[in-house]
């Protein structure tokens, strides 16, 4: 899951390292980039206290930005998990633009929320109605990522930026702990 991405290790079965006690000052991508002068960010479309993400990321080299950084007029759609991916990507763009303006290289781990049950997203963006299942959520996520990359293409930092797109967990990472 998230720890696999942050720690560059295979997903762990059972309880996520993100949720476990004594999980601070670990060797994470965020801490490595921070030690090299980068602003390392974890940007999440929901509330960072969910699943202990605020604590884990903030104690492991990341600055955490979540739904609380958005003003009410910046939220065009919200469901039980958080804001629409488009709203999250606009927030991420604003944070990245700040880093660029301050002449700081950046590393941003951005976590969207639309591709989770109940699979809801803003109407009219894609040809599959909201609330109808995973296929629509995946297509909306694809639409939002495409829009983000296209919008980023007009930014002065774009040509020096690597985009890596992965899921936050896979179906096979669950397991039992003895």
Task: Put a short name on every predicted segment.
Residues 1-178:
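Solvent-exposed soluble domains appended to multi-pass membrane proteins
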């Amino acid at each position: 899951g998230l720890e696999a991405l942050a720690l560059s290790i295979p997903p762990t079965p059972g309880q996520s390292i993100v949720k476990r006690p004594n999980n601070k000052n670990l060797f994470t991508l965020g801490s490595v980039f921070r030690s090299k002068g980068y602003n390392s960010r974890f940007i999440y479309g929901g509330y960072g206290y969910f699943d202990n993400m605020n604590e884990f990321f903030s104690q492991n080299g990341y600055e955490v930005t979540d739904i609380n950084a958005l003003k009410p007029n910046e939220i065009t759609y919200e469901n039980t998990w958080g804001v629409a991916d488009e709203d999250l990507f606009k927030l991420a763009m604003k944070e990245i633009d700040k880093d660029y303006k301050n002449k700081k290289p950046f590393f941003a781990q951005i976590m969207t929320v639309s591709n989770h049950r109940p699979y809801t997203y803003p109407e009219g963006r894609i040809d599959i109605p909201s609330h109808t299942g995973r296929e629509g959520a995946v297509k909306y996520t694809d639409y939002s990522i495409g829009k983000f990359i296209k919008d980023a293409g007009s930014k002065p930092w774009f040509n020096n930026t690597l985009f890596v797109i992965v899921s936050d967990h896979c179906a096979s990472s669950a397991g039992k702990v003895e």
